[in-house]
Amino acid sequence: MLILLKKAVKLKIIRPIDFYFSQFIAQKNNIVMLVAACVSYESSRGYISLPIKYFEKHYFFSSSNEVFIKKILTLLEKKINWPVELLKHASIGNGGTSTPLVLHKKKIYLYKMWKSESNIFNYLYTKNKKNKINQKKCSKILENLFPQKNMSFQKIAVALTLINNITFIIGGPGTGKTTTILKIIIALIKSSKKSIKIQLSAPTGKATTHLNEILKNNIFDLYFSEKEKCSLPSTATTIHQLLGIQKISQKSFFNKSNCLDLDVLIIDEISMVDILMMEKILSSISKNTKLIFIGDHNQLGPIESGSILRKICYYANDGYSFKSMISIEKLTQYKLCKKINKKTTNFISDNICVLNKNYRFNKNSGIYTLSNAIFKKKTRIIESLFDNSIKNIFFYETNSSEQYKKMIKNICLNYEDFWEKIYKKATMKEIIESFQNYQVLCILHDGLFGVNIINKKLEENMYKKNIIKYFYIDGEEWYIGKPIMIINNNRALNVSNGNIGITNINKNGILQVSFLKENNTINNIPVKILRNYKTAWAITVHKSQGSEFMNTALILPNFNSHILNKDTLYTGITRSRKILSIFSDKKIFLNTIFKNTNKILF
């Protein structure tokens, strides 16, 4: 097994850390060595635990390399009773004592993952009390916010936040999550007898910028008195800033011994939050704080291990308990589908609302059609993409050097309006908005189809056409119109990770990068004081999360990568509001959708 796992590292099936962890756990026991490597590897892909069925059905490393799987099976005994064999080993326990791995309810965990999951679900079970509300008053508030007669899942979501102490609101792009946040804030303030402390937060600086836009919405003037406006939060903050997390130690200033003084905490883009961060959030708030989480569980998961939102959403289809159903019906005046959840996990499903209606894409939209087909694995619709039969979506093959060159030329043509605005000396706002209409997205950083080389190739093409002219500052290449993306939050310069600005020269001849802020003002930063940035003709899908563009180009690598999966593809596709160009090999595209990424069951 040792030799095989070493080979797996060379073949890039697993990471070096997965190999070393397996050796740390068990140097001689083939079964435990394999299990340790699998758990470590799959945790890096967002899975909190692995069911025993994963091993019984030989899904090792979610690999499609049949030769490699067969070699593993030859080393193992023909018939293995996995739970019995695992619990024989000293490094695996049942959670009663600290062991590197834990086997619990036919699932195997890293100890820290098991501990965090246990704490989170214990919190959901014990702390989610139902709030005593003025039903007549709350029902009237909901009626004012949602005057339409048709059933609105947004209304159900807002009702749940009034009833529950913890609520999870799930929805894809265009399902009205932003509108729902607005109406939640209005409903909570209007229903409260006193002034309340509300805080909005998100995992990234870019996402908090979006929340700050919500707080500046004029709709609050229509609903609130001057006294009620005092309950509006002044600004959104990142989760790290909110909890006072130290950069090196990762310890939180706020914790169970020093709780945040809040009545309501609303966290957006919760899909980016990993299981360990979720545990920190829950341990830092008081038992009376109302928690509202909002996100899309189909989007890319967190960079760190463990997609807790996906785990929680597993229970979404179970329906509401009878008690919750009655409460929702009384508040909303709706008649809900009588699918009553009698399971012991209804303390989770009672807190979930899935926003189903899409307000951004109508059902004839190409983006909606393709993204929906990908998750439902509708082969006929997906294959119709290849002959460009899906509205406003264009597929280009990238199997040859000639096709690659055409891709670069095609992309450059989409910047004609941007360059024209620069040459005609349009306002900086107009120039930035023109750039923001079109964005190139890549899956990877490196390689021929990664952001680093794509950015270089685009610059080379523009240089050959005399579109850009280089000059050097401190040995670095610059040119007018160069797009720059910030990669670290910088509060002193008022820029966030993911912000994109455009290089220009001001009236005094100083080279600067200009960023369009949420209030439509321009933030100009001289190049000489700018730090931590990258060229941004192309950015990764991960960096684009939370953004949207009218026109998007999505570039897939020319090989199967563990980073390229259905979630990445879905996230990339749904960044576009209207037009999408996909550059990919057909086989790679199909394999990304149909490969066995969902064999790991909760």
From Swiss-Prot:
It catalyses: Couples ATP hydrolysis with the unwinding of duplex DNA at the replication fork by translocating in the 5'-3' direction. This creates two antiparallel DNA single strands (ssDNA). The leading ssDNA polymer is the template for DNA polymerase III holoenzyme which synthesizes a continuous strand; ATP + H2O = ADP + phosphate + H(+). Keywords: ATP-binding, DNA damage, DNA repair, DNA-binding, Exonuclease, Helicase, Hydrolase, Isomerase, Nuclease, Nucleotide-binding. ATP binds at residues 171-178. Its EC number is 5.6.2.3. CDD domains: DEXSc_RecD-like (cd17933), SF1_C_RecD (cd18809). It is an enzyme of class 5 (isomerase). Belongs to the RecD family. In the RecBCD complex, RecB has a slow 3'-5' helicase, an exonuclease activity and loads RecA onto ssDNA, RecD has a fast 5'-3' helicase activity, while RecC stimulates the ATPase and processivity of the RecB helicase and contributes to recognition of the Chi site. This is RecBCD enzyme subunit RecD. It comes from Buchnera aphidicola subsp. Acyrthosiphon pisum (strain APS) (Acyrthosiphon pisum symbiotic bacterium).
